Amino acid sequence: MSALGSRETHVLTTIIESYITSAAPVGSRTVSRRSGLALSPASMRNTMSDLTDMGFLEQPHTSAGRIPTPKAFRLYVDALLRQSARRDEAPLHMVEALHGHEPEVGALLRRASNLVSEHARQVSMVLAPGPAEARLRSLDFVPAGEGLVLAVLVLEGGMVRTRLVRDDTHFGSDELVRFGNYINAHYRGHTLSGIRNSIHHELSGGGAQLEAMCAQALALGSLALDSIDDDRELYVNGTRNILDQAEFAELGRMRELMDALEERSRLLELLDRTILEDDVHVTFYPDDVSGAAQRRAPDGLRGCSMVSAPYGGASPLGVIGVIGPVRMDYRKVLPLVGAVSRVLTQLLRERFATG
């Protein structure tokens, strides 16, 4: 907390961490007892008064102690982030909890989300990778009725996508099998985005003259791949932890937050905005968002913060996040989110085209 002197920093940190624990205004006696500073009662009150004047503390009632403002939490969190940035290795128990048990990507991410919610005692979210950068394991075409073909794509990591595509030529089953075999022989192990680009290049005349069967296979493959949108799963765990938070004890406020967590499209947007962050990132609502982003953020998130981190390396695949009250135990949550992010990066790097 370089913006403050050592005494002010120590006092403010003590108040913040006392408030995180108690959810109640913190008085000067509590600060004196917990800080270990040899300050007279008058000096302690003066220091707290100075912090109030600087906008780091507020007094909800004249007879009450002080509570930290969002400005104080931002200063506190930034200091913790600088400390956690020096930790490169994920704790062994996190690695063991996720390694080797979940070969399918969806199951792995559900496990990660559950692990984070259990340890953080907050709501956790994991935004799954979209299929565009997943590698193809197999593509099969199956007749699906008059003029229709079912394309079944199996991707590395166990993701499966199915799409119905038009078949105006009315190909037979044997032809569809040959088309699938051709595409698998040429493109297995490639990313869907790379396959799309390559097929479009071939069909537009960029490659050698194609045989009729090859052209038909590529045309059908192009239809199948172009119909695959970048739909993404969002795994949410720990909503019951809301009940344990003093901020949401009032029924109406709890319902607001629960409603916000049901707005999947908006949660996806919030997580997507943090996917290009270098490491663990903290967003306070509504203080850290403005303009269109503020209008899109669910109203129920006011007074909340989100700790998030991308996973996947240089080309991020998704985001892991924790949502809770601003009065969150950041000393626990920041390294937790960072550790799980690093483990997911290690586990998923080989299944996707990541750096």
Curated annotation (Swiss-Prot):
GO molecular function: DNA binding
This protein's record includes keyword Repressor: yes
InterPro entries: GAF-like_dom_sf, HrcA, HrcA_C, WH-like_DNA-bd_sf, WH_DNA-bd_sf
Keywords on record: Repressor, Stress response, Transcription, Transcription regulation
Pfam families for this protein: HrcA
Function text: Negative regulator of class I heat shock genes (grpE-dnaK-dnaJ and groELS operons). Prevents heat-shock induction of these operons.
Protein name: Heat-inducible transcription repressor HrcA
Organism encoding this protein: Nitratidesulfovibrio vulgaris (strain DP4)
